[in-house]
């Protein structure tokens, strides 16, 4: 199982998702946890790498965990440990790193363009 951390930014039934180079589906900003890292440390590192965003530990709040289908690895599962940010961020001014080819808001019902584990998150935590 691939253990990951992710930033879940949701408003008005839309999620902020990113697309990584050479991948079709969009998923939460974040990534794999390196050996010896806490969940928060891993998310801080990933957000700095992907979005050039530096957040203090106190600005991140754990909101839940799901296990879903890994993307793009077939026949693998991923554990997503989700966090939200406890301060306002102007997402239109956030610059992505070279590995991120796109960042945009998706309606939670746009399952065709969203990675499987993100759709699992939506079913578990967002859809009522």
Where are these regions (language model features)?
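Conserved Nudix-box catalytic region and its N-terminal flanking loop in Nudix hydrolases
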Residues: 11-50
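Short secondary-structure boundary/capping segments
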Residues: 7-8, 18, 73-75, 92-97
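NUDIX/MutT-family hydrolases
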Residues: 82-84, 93-125
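Short hydrophobic/aromatic beta-strand or adjacent loop that forms the aromatic wall/cage
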Residues: 2-6, 77-82, 100
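Active-site segment of metal-dependent pyrophosphate-handling enzymes
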Residues: 52-90
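Conserved N-terminal beta-strand and adjoining loop/helix that marks the start
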Residues: 1-15
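Short aromatic/basic micro-patch
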Residues: 27, 77, 105
């Amino acid at each position: 199982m691939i253990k990951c951390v992710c930033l879940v930014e949701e408003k008005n039934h839309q999620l902020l998702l990113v697309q990584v180079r050479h991948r079709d589906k969009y998923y939460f900003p974040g990534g794999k946890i390196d050996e010896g890292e806490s969940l928060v440390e891993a998310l801080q590192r990933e957000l700095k790498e992907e979005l050039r965003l530096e957040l203090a530990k106190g600005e991140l709040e754990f909101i839940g965990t799901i296990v879903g289908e890994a993307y793009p690895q077939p026949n693998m599962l991923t554990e997503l440990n989700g966090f939200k940010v406890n301060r306002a961020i102007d997402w239109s001014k956030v610059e992505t790193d070279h590995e991120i080819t796109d960042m945009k808001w998706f309606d939670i019902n746009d399952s065709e363009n969203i990675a499987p584990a993100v759709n699992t998150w939506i079913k578990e935590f967002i859809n009522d």
